[in-house]
Every structure is written in structure tokens, then in C-alpha cells.
Amino acid sequence: MSVAVLAWALAACSESPPDDSAGGGGTGPVGSGGAGSTAETSSSAAEGTASSATTGAGTGGGGGAPPDGECASVSEVPTELGLDPFYKKYVDASGIPIVSSEGPPDAALLRACSVVVRMLGPRDDVRQAMIANHTRVAVMAETEVTSDIPEHSDLYEAFPGTDWDTRARGLGATPARPASSCAEENVLCYPSDPYRGEDILVHEFSHAIAIMGIAFAEPTFNRELADVFEGAIQAGKWANTYAATNKDEYWAEGVQDWFDTNIESIPGNGIHNEINTRAELREYDRPLHDLIARYFADDAWRPSCP
């Protein structure tokens, strides 16, 4: 889980809206679930960058037909999107483009689309903010690497000292780099996926929802999240877990729990603890549960492997 931590170091530079809890400014990637090295700085919606992950989808990144017949087919990338010619495939996820090269199978884009549509369902204001910020999701082929994604192709130059292609199989969207990425092998739950057990897309897209959507729709969100996080830490919760890293990873790990796409560890192992489901989150950290409940549907849908 070392990738994510680096991400928030990159997050120190962002362009999302400032509020009373954090300043603006910046361009780099944000932390994501599944990392473990030492952190340099914390990332946030107000700091905005790309959240990085080395987590995987044990329960998968797809599952459940999206509403209204969305995510039914893959097409060419509309020219009006103005995207890099690297992208050849496209699916519309309620206004959020899901794109890839020719490499990934169509099934990977369709399952990513399904997850995005379901996660965005309840809050149209957040979705509209994300659309206005040109948020998109890029699906890497199993044979592709992070720097193949055009929005992330400069990471080695912008943030030297990290081997992004080795360490990251997913990054979250920020105003400077508005693509969230995920990987074919994780989305489709291949046996070869080294990160089975978690869902990169759920974790990373939850960062994008916060950074590219909620922070614009609700300018006080960062402060509220910070207060909830600080209260949990002061109460001794999330000790020896990745959720304790900063408010952004606290949020993303909580969203994974909400969708039952996290890993359980008893005792805590520095990354996870015994909390990995919505019901357990409600009992363990009610303020975080209730904050998340404002943005995601409290229904029976969960991502699932094909």
C-alpha cells in the first residue's frame, strides 16, 4: 500500500476550491487505499491531485446492471471530448466518460461504467460538478502501465523518485489530472490480479467524487470531513490502519467499507482492521457512516466479480 501514500505527497498541489479547512493549489496524485510507506503530505479535495492505489478488487469492480439501460455498449471516443488519441474506446456513465486504448476488453469498460453509475446515483449536484470539471475514468489494459495514461504520463518528471509504473495500478482524478484510472485485471477480477480483495475503482473514484464533485457542490465539505476524521482519531479509532493516514484516505477507506469492497484484518495490520462492511462501519464509526450516507445510496447494490 505504499503507492497511495506517495499520492498524497503529490496532492500537496491542487486546484480544487479552497475552504476554511485547507488551501488550494497543486497538481499531483492523492493517496489511495492499499499503500503503506511514509507520507510526506496529505491530500484532499481542496488540495486536489490524483489518488494512487495499489489495492485490488477481491469482490470486483463491476456487478449489477446499471439503471436505465446505461453501460450497454462501447463505441469510439467522441471527438468533441477533445481527448488524447491514445483513447480509442468509450462508454458514457451518466455523463462521465469511461475510456481506454484498444487494449482492454469491452467488458472492463462496461463494468467500470456500471460501478461509476451506481456510485453517482443519489447526488445529481455532485455528478454535475464532476462533469463540469471534465472528470473521466481511464481503464488500463493488463499490459499497460500508469504512465501510458495520457493524463498521468508526466508523473516521472513532475514527481521524480517514485516508480509509478511499478507501484500504481490506479490514480484518482483531480483538476490538474482529471482522469481516475483503474486496471483491467482488477476490474474483471482476474486470478492474476495481485491486489485481489479490494476494489481500486471504488476507492479511487471515491477520491474523485470528493475532489471533483463534493468539494465544488459543498464548499464546507473538507472542513466537515476533517472534523469527523479528527474526532475518530481522538477517540482511538482506526489505529494501525490506512484510514488513519489522513482525512482523504479515511474517506476512501470508509467508502470501500460502505460498498463492502474492503479487506478485513484481525488484528489491524497497518492497513486494515476488522471493519470492512457497511453494517460494521455504522456500528464502529457512526459519524463517518452518516457522512458517507449523504452521498451514496443505502441500498442492496454492491460491486461484484463477473
Where are the model-predicted features located?
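Ser/Thr-rich, Pro/Gly/Ala-heavy low-complexity intrinsically disordered linkers and tails
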Residues: 1, 8-68
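Short secondary-structure subsegments characteristic of cysteine-rich extracellular domains
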Residues: 6-7, 281
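Acidic/His-rich structured neighborhood in mature extracellular/periplasmic domains
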Residues: 69, 78, 85-86, 93-96, ...
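Metalloprotease/metallohydrolase-associated module, dominated by Zn2+-dependent proteases
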Residues: 74-86, 99, 155-191, 225-306
